[in-house]
Amino acid sequence: MAELQQLRVQEAVDSMVKSLERENIRKMQGLMFRCSAACCEESQASMQQVHQCIERCHAPLAQAQALVTSELEKFQDRLARCTMYCNDKAKDSIDAGSKELHVKRQLETCVTKCVDDHMNLIPTMTRKMKESLSSIGK
């Protein structure tokens, strides 16, 4: 993928992840740590009970992190498939005898369209993740 296009996607995804971390994940981390601390304050509990309590406290955060990771992987896979299609199209054009400059332009245009299309998916993906993260916290 063209470096500029890659940078555009990376900055948009980084911004989304920072927003999710600030608005959702961080609150869940705070709850998890306070919950875990309460487990440790339980003087009558056995070591195993305290450990299980801490595991229960950590479960929502682990679920949230898994959700974000899964959505980002799906997004990355879709973008990779799109750019792979562009590469295949360019290779087919070269095999058919097209000029290299024409093929490069065609490839650039195709990759830019992939990036534009996927950039347009980010707001919906963000909203969907925020909704899912909110429901995990409850």
Swiss-Prot record:
Modified residues (N-acetylalanine): 2
One GO cellular component term noted in the UniProt record for this chain: cytoplasm
Family membership noted in the UniProt record: Belongs to the FAM136 family.
UniProt-recorded name of the protein: Protein FAM136A
Keywords for this protein: Acetylation, Phosphoprotein
Gene: FAM136A
Modification sites for Phosphothreonine: 124, 126
Domain of life: Eukaryota
